[in-house]
């Protein structure tokens, strides 16, 4: 009878926990290389944080550690993205229907990264490898545990190696990377059941983008069709003065919503960006633990270079 009541209490506790669960948001760039241990568990470790990696997932878990400890991790990653493009029935952009991207597939794909204070390397890699390192120390008979670690809470980097890849308009190269190089942290054991902790990760934030751009909108398409109807191939039109210089840009100034319009390149970073993690861990029994963590958002101000090159199509049309 006692065992039956115990299982009823456990089931009731699980129902209450599930009923109170809310929706969450996730991003494909986060927690992919933070912890090998947590990744193998789907990062569902808030109530059972893994050792020194508790710095990120729940700093209260540091109070579980004893004496001096060291943490090493190693990982290899290969990011792949594949797409095939098609156009729906009745597709038209201002009268243009033959999109050269339709019916094509993405090409070769490489990995890249952001090297702090250097930027993105000149070439991509088939696989990226990385490592993590952490230390913790708990004095004898002390409720405090001190720790620090190096890890990647946010990382994704790819480069399309085919110059004519149809997905180049969605990013020829892109890197979003956050490297925590120092994370002073402390866990405090309130009693045998309750622990709290706080961490202050200090990170380098990097962002790089290289993308081709086109402007498939109806206005551009309609103007391009007007040019086809009024502008001869070898020169202007005598009535062009009434058409607001529609033909003055010459052959290169002919608008096409499917042609490359520009190329944008961004390389920016923040060398020092601080955030905060605060957590609590309650372990009333050896078979259950409840954890909560708050991660302060980053308001990093990135500084770097920005370049925007327009193609002759837009330049000549504007000049005309």
Model regions and ranges:
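Bacterial N-terminal signal peptides
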Residues: 10-22
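Bacterial N-terminal signal peptides that target proteins for export
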Residues: 2-12
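Outer-membrane beta-barrel porins/channels
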Residues: 25-42, 50, 101, 106, ...
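N-terminal, post-signal peptide beta-strand-biased segments of exported outer-membrane/organellar beta-barrel
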Residues: 22-152
């Amino acid at each position: 009878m006692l065992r039956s009541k115990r299982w009823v209490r456990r089931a009731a506790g699980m129902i209450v926990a599930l009923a109170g669960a809310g929706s969450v948001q996730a991003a494909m760039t986060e927690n992919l290389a933070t912890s090998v241990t947590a990744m193998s568990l789907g990062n569902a470790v808030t109530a059972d944080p893994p050792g020194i990696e508790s710095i990120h997932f729940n700093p209260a878990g540091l109070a579980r550690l004893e004496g001096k400890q060291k943490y090493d991790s190693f990982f290899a990653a290969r990011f792949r993205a594949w797409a095939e493009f098609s156009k729906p029935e009745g597709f038209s952009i201002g009268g243009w229907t033959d999109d050269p991207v339709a019916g094509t597939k993405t090409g070769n794909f490489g990995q890249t990264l952001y090297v702090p204070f250097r930027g993105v390397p000149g070439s991509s890699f088939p696989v990226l490898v990385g490592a993590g390192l952490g230390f913790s120390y708990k004095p004898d008979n002390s409720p405090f545990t001190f720790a620090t670690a190096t890890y990647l809470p946010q990382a994704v980097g790819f480069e399309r190696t085919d110059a004519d890849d149809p997905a180049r308009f969605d990013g020829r190269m892109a890197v979003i990377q956050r490297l925590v190089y120092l994370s002073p942290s402390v866990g405090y054991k309130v009693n045998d059941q309750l622990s709290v902790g706080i961490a202050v990760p200090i990170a380098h934030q990097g962002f790089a983008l290289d993308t081709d751009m086109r402007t498939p909108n109806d206005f551009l398409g309609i103007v391009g069709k007007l040019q086809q109807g009024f502008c001869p191939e070898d020169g202007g039109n005598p009535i062009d003065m009434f058409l607001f210089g529609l033909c003055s840009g010459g052959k290169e100034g002919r608008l096409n919503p499917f042609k490359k319009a520009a190329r944008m390149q961004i390389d920016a970073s923040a060398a020092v960006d601080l955030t905060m993690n605060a957590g609590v861990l309650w372990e009333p029994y050896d078979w259950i633990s409840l954890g909560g963590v708050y991660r302060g958002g980053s308001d990093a101000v990135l500084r770097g270079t920005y370049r925007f090159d327009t193609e002759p199509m837009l330049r000549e049309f504007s000049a005309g």
